Amino acid sequence: MSNSSSSKLGGQCLVVGGIISFIIFIIQILIGGPPPGNEHIFSYFANETVGRGSATVIYTLLWTFANVLIAYGILVLNGSLQEQQKDGLLGLGTFLFIVGQIGFMIATSMDVAIIYAQDSANIANIASGQMSVFFMFGPVAFLGGALVSLNLASREYINALYARITAVVFLIVIVAFIYSSFNIADPGNHNIPSTIIPAFAGISIAQFFIVIWNLMVGMKMMKN
């Protein structure tokens, strides 16, 4: 496969993966939401997952597939840009992003585990494991995304201002993840929904920047 066709395929993967991921995110927001006051966080999310039934399996399959497409697109982008100009931070950002995506996919797959184990296990424990993976890999993925976005800004690969703003948003989300991670480590906060609001609000806002970023970068790759 030529570099041109590889870049085009990578761009298509970014566009398609970005759109699917964003649609799944919007659906999850519409049918879900933060826990009500005094509700045990892990039990709430586990029960919400069970309540969605087999739809959870569909959402998880689609979201996982979308993230695989996005990861491939970023990998192709890195290869293409490295051929033009070597950059260690771009390579590091790509690696961190892909590792973070793998973590996200593992965490999301635990939704299916909750469905499968609903009649034989403490599903709240599975939800707590899911959230721990999500919180630990989240900063890795967003740091990687920030490094890649800053590199694109320096190359003016896409609109430099938008790329820098997106990178700043990603860095703020990292702080929100870390803040929520330490708060939820205290069992006394497990019945306080506001404990996880910073992380979930951050990633929700970031999703709107991400889908536009994926479309901009993907379409640029398809033109190369």
Identify what each model region corresponds to.
Residues 1-224:
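Hydrophobic, aromatic-enriched alpha-helical segments typical of multi-pass transmembrane helices
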